[in-house]
Amino acid sequence: MDNEVVIDVQNLTKSFNDFVAVDSISFDVKKGEIFGLLGPNGAGKSTTLRLLSTLSKPTKGTATIGGYDIVKDDTEVRKLIGIVSEKMIMYDRLTARENLIFFGSLFNIPKDILAKRINELLELVQLTNWKNAKVGTFSTGMRQRMNVIRALLNMPQVMFLDEPTLGLDPQSSVEIREFIKKLNRENRTTIIITTHMMVDADLLCDRIGIMDHAKIVALDTSTNLKKLISGADTTIMKLEIGNLSPDIIEAVRACKCIDAVTQENSTHLRIIAHGDEAFDSVIDAVRAKEGKINSMENLQPTLEDVFLHITGHEVRDSADQKIPMARHGRFGSQPQGRIR
């Protein structure tokens, strides 16, 4: 990664009548960087990718890719980018090679160059031995690798990956993450990833923009984001309570020191709190409801903790499922309503 800015976004906004899907976001992405947009479904991540990939026009604001404006120079922008959407675009009845020949022909790539490129890409994702097999017989992980190299046929400088590990089993997710890192390392491809998966953001991204309610509410490296809640004033604790009940949870949430509370299972609470008296306050609250504390552990912060700390709620699969886990985030009360 170097200091050359490839993507520059300034006050980008997308509205549908009175509904704001992307609300005046600004960020830049440097050449060779893997940049992540992290947040729940409905936060505005995919809409942002649609704007940057010229599939939708912004209501306000500007963005450039490789120096080209996404509205005025949309044709030039499209020559620079590759898009991997959440939906896999492949024809099951065609072989891997036939699929790539078809999609490569849409870019008007000369046949001899396309044939060589297909062989190189199949080798890159370790699918050479399956080049003559029908894609309909592939595992989900293999299909996702095919989906990615389809977007690489035109040798893009910039890749947009929308939820690249969504729906994959753990092993396939690892394979896709390793491939993304290899692509970035060997080709210096600039990559923007949207995800609600903490592990993807943590393991892949050089910098992360946390999105919530159509806004970017924090932007930094994973390490620096975690430092937001790793100071002397903040405590992250895990409690095992043998007789955990709704009354006990509400009593803990009512403590003035509490920033966020998550119930992990039938006996465990994960708590973010502030102040010197945090431990004592939580223990007193549990015991006041006759709770039986079996264990108490001090934890290191995760990106999930950062999201809770900033927004006051968890990252959920759907914006409709967001459940406030405390009275407010440490960065102030959050706007009402849901981004769809």
Predicted regions and their residues:
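Conserved catalytic motifs of ABC-family nucleotide-binding domains
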Residues: 155
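Conserved ABC ATPase signature
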Residues: 134-138
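Conserved ABC ATPase "signature" region
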Residues: 101, 105, 112-130
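ABC transporter nucleotide-binding domain
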Residues: 178-274
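Conserved ABC transporter NBD signature motif
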Residues: 61-72, 77
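Catalytic Walker B motif of ABC-type/P-loop ATPase nucleotide-binding domains
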Residues: 159-162
